[in-house]
Amino acid sequence: MAEAQAAVGTSSDRSNHYSRPVFKQVLKVNSLQAQRVMERSFERVSNSLFSIDVILRIIGEQDEIDQVETVILEQISKVSEDLDKATAQLNKLMEDNGIDMMPGYTNPNEYTIEINSPQVAQFAHLIRKLDTLMGIVDTLWLNTVLTSKQRTDATYQWQQRLIKLAGRIIGIEKRARISAHSKGKEGEVAEAAPESATGDKEIADEAEKTGEDKAA
């Protein structure tokens, strides 16, 4: 079994000012699509969610804090609900076809992750849900209920849903930094929550689009 690391930086990597609660967990991911989402986005999203929280506390305007937290929750909840609906539909398809066994995977990965906010926990849970859904898709494909094209379309669609969500969360972080800059708190924010680079072009483009949409 392969092992990988994600979001394992210590609190001193991010901020030396506060001692924050954190859970360390090992997240096992079977499917290729969930592994891609994990490796492309989890650490960067975790850093963004941490930074958003720090930046909003520095800005110190409760209405803005509540508004941003609500936007993030709504976006995560929408993807979660859609994953649940798709999972229920495909579970019914398995039941209708008398399928009650799931395949194993040849190369599952384990990721050591830090859960340092409720939103990070929710994003990790989305990846678990994605992994479960991909397992059902693969089961139906192996049993010839789904065609290869249907499998490819479904796996790509759901992988991209989470990748785009990651980009939107990073875009919200960028908007929070712009807001802090407009309030003269850029230096304080830079010290407490240094900005991380987004190496994945697709995620970076989605983040940029989110920032532009909200700034307009």
Language model region names:
Residues 150-155:
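Short hydrophobic alpha-helical segments that form membrane-spanning helices or hydrophobic packing faces
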Residues 1-126, 132, 139, 156-216:
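Polar/charged low-complexity regulatory segments
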